[in-house]
C-alpha cells in the first residue's frame, strides 16, 4: 500500500506539477505568527535559552524550538503565554532506533513540550525501506498522541522522488507537518522544496521551512510558496526587517 501511494504521487507529480506561489504576498503578522524561534546549537547555555524565550514573548512568535534538555526551562520561562515549546527527536541524524525516538518524544512531552520535530531515517528512506520509515514515524506519533509531530525529511540529501516518498509516508503515518531541514545538513530550505512538499501533503498537513532563513524577504518567500511555519534562529532580525519595510 505504501509503495502504491508513493508511485501514485510520483505519477501525479510528473503529469500535473507546476511551480508557482500558493499566495500573492505575506505581511509582517503572517511572518511573526509563523516563526518558531530556534536555538539548537550544541553550545547553547541556559541564559541563551532564557533570552530566546524572552525574545519570543516580546515579538509574539508562534513558538521556540530548543534541544530536549532545555524543554523544562523553556516551559518555565514561557509560563502564562501562548508561545509553544517545540523540541527535537532523533536529532540531527535521524539514525536512532525507533524505540529510542519514541521514548525521547515521551520524555519531551513529560517535560513540557507542545510539539515534536523528529528526524526521518534518511538512510532507510534512500534504501526504499518504506515500512521501516513508516513505523519509525508512526511510533513517535502514537507515543505522544494529541501532540503535533513534524517530520524533518532533510531535503538536502534527497532527490525529488525521495522527497515525494518522505512526504507521502509522513502523511500515511499520521504526522502533522513535514519540515525541510535540521539546519545541520549540507543545505537548508528552498522555495522549490517547500512548494513541492506542500503540493504533495496538501491542506491536511503543514509544512515547516527551516535552515538558512535569515531575512524578512526569505520568510515571506517561504510562506508564499506554502510554508505554514518558519524555523529560524534569526526571528528578531526577520521581524525588524519587516518593521523597517512596513513600519511598526
Swiss-Prot record:
Top-rank taxon, per record: Bacteria
Active-site residues annotated for this sequence: 117, 179, 208
Keyword Cytoplasm included in the entry's annotation: yes
Enzyme class: lyase
UniProt catalytic activity: 2-deoxy-D-ribose 5-phosphate = D-glyceraldehyde 3-phosphate + acetaldehyde
Record keyword Hydrolase present: no
Keyword annotations from UniProtKB, A to Z: Cytoplasm, Lyase, Schiff base
UniProt pathway: Carbohydrate degradation; 2-deoxy-D-ribose 1-phosphate degradation; D-glyceraldehyde 3-phosphate and acetaldehyde from 2-deoxy-alpha-D-ribose 1-phosphate: step 2/2
EC number: 4.1.2.4
GO biological process: 2-deoxyribose 1-phosphate catabolic process; carbohydrate catabolic process; deoxyribonucleotide catabolic process
Gene3D superfamilies (alphabetical): Aldolase class I
Any single Gene Ontology cellular-component annotation: cytoplasm
InterPro entries: Aldolase_TIM, DeoC, DeoC/FbaB/LacD_aldolase, DeoC_typeI
Pfam families: DeoC (PF01791)
Gene Ontology MF annotations: deoxyribose-phosphate aldolase activity
Major subcellular location class: cytoplasm
Subcellular location: Cytoplasm
Similarity comment: family membership: Belongs to the DeoC/FbaB aldolase family. DeoC type 1 subfamily.
Function, as annotated: Catalyzes a reversible aldol reaction between acetaldehyde and D-glyceraldehyde 3-phosphate to generate 2-deoxy-D-ribose 5-phosphate.
Protein name: Deoxyribose-phosphate aldolase
